[in-house]
Design a protein with these regions (language model features):
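Short, Lys/Arg-enriched N-terminal segments with co-localized hydrophobic residues
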Residues: 1-9
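Membrane-helix and juxtamembrane interface regions of eukaryotic multi-pass membrane proteins
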Residues: 11-18, 23, 27-193, 198-201, ...
Length: 294
């Protein structure tokens, strides 16, 4: 059942949250640079937790697909649709949890003082350059587990090149941050910007495939309204600022020169992918509006 799969994944987050120490707070309520730092030695433990999350996401997807195969009243039971729909249900769960938690963690680091510090990545400041906290690493393990499970699904069923590249990108940055215990500001903000519109995309896909015209149009509008400013506006702006900071040497002390430049190029690639996707999205949106008027 989709609700059961959602509860299943949420329980995983709650269980792993028990192991994470709360963020330390400074005088202004932001993260203490020295609080709850995760040493690189904990990388093996985080890898195990990532694997557990991946297994839970995969199991949740399988259970959801089995339910949809039998729940003919939802009109998502034909052919490979149950598997594709289950992937969207799990995606909605992950994106909702990860984007909200990432936004909270970005705020804890002081990253929301200015407009997402778009023109000066806050990694160069004291708050941003502080070691990763246990809570941040738990969220990274949660997201990495999802991307591993979904990547296996994509390779087996849909094989969408854009999404495969997206998952490879994230599975480069997120685990590196967990293993090194540094640079949490980058995946935190990237996830907050990149995943916030995903729930609308998943729900729109489900409504469209099920033939629910009542929900399809408003969900499409909600996705477009959230995707364009976040993924076409803010994310490319942040990627450009991150590129400048990385190649100017400002982030060398935090991430190391090679890692800073690698992450900057990957974030820029994500921004470019968003622009390509947006072009197709806007074209489809305008086409749909013309058909409605006709």
């Amino acid at each position: 059942h989709p609700a059961a799969a959602t509860s299943f994944v949420m329980a995983a987050v709650a269980e792993n949250g028990k192991h994470a120490a709360p963020n330390g707070n400074g005088k202004n309520g932001h993260a203490d640079p020295n609080a709850d730092a995760v040493p690189p030695a904990d990388g093996l433990q985080l890898a195990r937790r990532t694997g557990v999350h991946a297994a839970r996401f995969a199991l949740g997807g399988i259970l959801t697909a089995l339910f949809l195969r039998r729940a003919k009243f939802l009109n998502l039971h034909r052919g490979t649709t149950p598997y594709e729909a289950a992937s969207r249900v799990v995606s909605v769960v992950h994106a909702t949890v990860a984007s909200i938690r990432s936004l909270q963690l970005a705020h804890a680091r002081g990253g929301l003082k200015s407009p997402f510090t778009l023109f000066d990545p806050w990694l160069s400041g004291a708050q941003g350059s502080a070691p990763n906290t246990a809570e941040e690493s738990e969220v990274f393990a949660f997201s990495s587990g999802y991307w591993i499970a979904d990547l296996l699904y994509l390779l087996g069923y849909e094989r969408d090149p854009l999404f495969v590249l997206h998952h490879v990108l994230t599975l480069t940055i997120w685990p590196q941050s967990m293993a090194s215990g540094r640079g949490a500001a980058v995946p935190t903000l990237a996830c907050a910007l990149g995943e916030a519109s995903t729930p609308f995309l998943g729900l729109w896909w489900l409504a469209k495939r099920a033939g629910n015209t009542t929900l399809e149009a408003p969900l499409s509008n909600a996705f477009t309204a959230s995707f364009l400013p976040l993924r076409v506006g803010l994310l490319p702006m942040y990627a450009l600022a991150f590129l400048r900071a990385a190649f100017s040497g400002k982030l060398d002390a935090v991430l190391g020169a090679a890692r800073a430049r690698l992450w900057a190029v990957l974030i820029a690639a994500a921004g470019a992918g968003s622009l390509v996707w947006a072009k197709a999205l806007v074209a489809g949106f305008l086409k749909a509006q013309k058909s409605v008027k006709a």
